[in-house]
């Protein structure tokens, strides 16, 4: 092991306004002490200092891994969902498409009285029927029509949003979970139609992150994006939950060499920079 990259736990991300700010928890000094190698952390602030949103960071990794192949849309579904367009003959770019797992996880906790941290495999949603009209109506919210570059803090799709737009009254737990899951898939498909498909003839979509393990979400995406093939990143030898850690490792390795490690086209930064702060071993 030569170097480690630590993204940390994001507790706030406010890229807009006169004083952009972001905060990730996780002290790299303890990691450096434990691992005995330099640790690169705090990647987002440098991008924001250069006028960017500080997110998404993953398009750089997507270009590095998939840039020589046919045009693909790479969809990471963590708490927030973000998409990258990468491949031969296209200019790599990316943006946050909307909620990823955050709303579905909140719904699972609310509906189970706290017993479930998430809807494992989409089992609850698969037993329900989504209210498609309610979900489609929410696409009128300003974020979805805003052009990239754009990024989100998960608080924008937090408990208040869930209670306001997905009330439990008159709905079975299965139907409510199905509706929230359908809405999540719908925001991704809608983002492609608005911002990805006009830029390139995409061969396929490739999913990663925890959301790619949710069968209800994946089935919803396949229906909404048909006939575009929707694959899982494990088809390419990368575990779905390993993509973001691999991206941090790549960014860290490049940072200690003083090499560019982000995609300004995705974040809106004024130019290419070296992101991250280095804590020596």
Label each region the model flagged:
Residues 15-22, 33, 37-116, 274:
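Phosphate-binding/catalytic loop of phosphoryl-transfer enzymes
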Residues 1-26:
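Short beta-strand-loop/turn "lid" adjacent to the catalytic site in phosphate-handling enzymes
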Residues 1-2, 190-202:
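Phosphate/pyrophosphate-binding loops at sites that engage ATP/ADP/AMP, CoA/4′-phosphopantetheine
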Residues 93-185, 189, 258, 267, ...:
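Conserved ATP-utilizing enzyme core subdomain
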Residues 222-247:
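Conserved phosphate-binding/catalytic loops in two-lobed NTP-binding clefts
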Residues 202-222:
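Glycine-rich phosphate-binding loops at beta-strand->alpha-helix junctions
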Residues 248-262:
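Alpha-helix capping/hinge segments and adjacent helical runs
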């Amino acid at each position: 092991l030569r170097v480690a990259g630590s993204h940390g736990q994001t507790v706030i991300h406010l890229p807009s306004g006169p004083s952009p700010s972001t905060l990730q928890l996780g002290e790299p000094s303890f990691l450096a002490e434990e691992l005995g190698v330099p640790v690169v952390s705090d990647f987002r602030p440098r991008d924001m200092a250069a006028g960017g949103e500080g997110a998404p960071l993953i398009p750089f990794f997507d270009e590095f891994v998939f840039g020589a192949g046919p045009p693909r849309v790479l969809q990471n579904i963590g708490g927030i969902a973000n998409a990258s367009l990468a491949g031969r003959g296209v200019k790599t770019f990316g943006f946050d498409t909307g909620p990823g797992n955050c709303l579905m996880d909140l719904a699972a906790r609310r509906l189970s009285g706290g017993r479930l941290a998430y809807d494992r495999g989409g089992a609850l949603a698969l037993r329900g029927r989504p209210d498609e009209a309610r979900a489609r109506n929410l696409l009128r919210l300003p974020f979805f029509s805003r052009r990239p570059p754009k990024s989100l803090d998960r608080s924008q799709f937090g408990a208040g949003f869930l209670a306001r737009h997905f009330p439990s009254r008159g709905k079975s737990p299965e139907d409510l979970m199905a509706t929230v899951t359908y809405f999540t898939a719908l925001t991704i498909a809608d983002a492609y139609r608005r911002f990805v498909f006009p830029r390139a003839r995409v061969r396929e979509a490739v999913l990663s992150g925890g959301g790619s393990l949710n069968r209800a979400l994946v089935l919803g995406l396949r229906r909404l994006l048909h006939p575009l093939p929707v694959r899982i990143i494990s088809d390419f030898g990368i575990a779905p939950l390993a993509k973001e850690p691999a991206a941090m490792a790549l960014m860290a390795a490049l940072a200690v060499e003083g090499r560019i490690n982000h995609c300004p086209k995705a974040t809106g930064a004024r130019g290419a920079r070296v992101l991250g702060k280095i804590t020596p071993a």
